[in-house]
Amino acid sequence: MEQTTVEALRSSPFFSGLSEEDLERIAEMGEPVSFGEGETIIEKGTSGDAMFVLLWGTTELEAGGRVHKPGAGQAVGEMALFSKKKRTATVTAGGPVEALRIPAERFHDFLLQNPSVAVGILEQVVERLREVQDRVEAWYG
């Protein structure tokens, strides 16, 4: 089922807890983009200047020899918004994909003007880091 941009943002764990008004403002700063099956959305090793929120369709994210399949409502490339490091994964369209491209520069400006939103996003980033830490501890004891 196709989601509206705000619905996709609302269902994204990355944006959970944000107000409807904030979600609408983020949706307005984004640019709708389309990808065909097999098309590269994000390429490992490249500089990241934007993140993508998937509106519909499925993708294949390959990192560290593992393949994940993010779908509607999920964000990909979000770490590029906070790091000057190269992309760590390749994301390709598993079929037709519609996404919202959120440029890093616009998103940074938005966060500077809205510190409470920045704190909410930071909480989500910290939660993801904790999940990764838990997995590493489970693998290596």
Q: Where on the chain are the PLM-derived regions?
A:
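Cytosolic regulatory regions built on CNB/CRP/Popeye-like sensor folds
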Residues: 1-141
